[in-house]
Regions:
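Catalytic histidine neighborhood in serine/cysteine hydrolases
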Residues: 99, 117-141, 149
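Serine-hydrolase catalytic machinery in alpha/beta-hydrolase-like enzymes
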Residues: 1-51
């Protein structure tokens, strides 16, 4: 791919043909990265794994499918946009009831539609019980109709649940490092100049959250 020249990617792609036998160099590392993000989100916000959905386009969709099926925790769902299942022979799903929605263009020249059909067949052959593949008359891109269908899947898979609202850590329970990170993220660096005591950092973060 890319005439043999390196380019940003989740893992190495050799060609555009059948990819189930590809080694996909870098795939395991990228999977670990995504799993780390999910775990960090859970640890920092308290958001349950069953309220998380992995979504990706093209190679990102492939990684989402490969990771979501094998993550130790059961997530709410997986959305694949113009993607496929890489390294299919290495994939060992841990949760067979995760709903998957796959949108794909019938005119896609990069990840051709037969590969999407093969992916659905392969994943179902691994025992996954809910895999929906929908086609759209588009190339390797997204369309309003596809996004609308995706939103319908999201609404069905993640209905409103106030009990699962993200819980922000109380500033009083934060370490100095966490307080400084929160201050940088909120763009409060100028207001933190000259502050020395932890109590001052706590007050700055708390006042910001309270809208003061």
């Amino acid at each position: 791919m890319n005439m043999g020249m390196p380019m940003p990617s989740w893992y190495d792609i050799v060609g555009l043909d059948e990819r189930s036998n590809e080694k996909c160099k870098g795939l395991a590392e990228s999977r670990a990265t995504v799993e780390g993000i999910l775990q960090k989100e859970h640890d920092s916000t308290g958001l349950p794994f069953n309220r998380m959905i992995l979504v990706g386009f093209s190679q990102g969709g492939a990684l989402s499918l490969f990771t979501g099926l094998q993550f130790d925790q059961a997530i709410a769902g997986i959305i694949v946009l113009s993607g496929y299942l890489p390294a299919a022979k290495q994939c060992q799903p841990k949760h067979l009831n995760i709903p998957i929605w796959h949108g794909h263009g019938t005119m896609d020249p990069l990840v051709q539609f037969p590969m999407a059909q093969k992916t659905k067949e392969t994943v179902e052959g691994l025992g996954v019980k809910s895999y929906t593949l929908e086609s759209f008359p588009i190339p390797h891109t997204l369309s309003p109709a596809e996004l609308q269908k995706m939103m319908q899947f999201l609404a069905k898979t993640l209905p409103p649940d106030d009990s699962c609202k993200i819980k922000l850590k109380d500033p009083k329970d934060m370490s100095i490092k966490e307080l400084k990170a929160a201050i940088r993220k909120a763009g409060l660096g100028s207001k933190a100049v000259g502050l020395m005591e932890k109590s001052e950092f706590i007050k700055l973060v708390q006042d910001y959250r309270d809208g003061k």
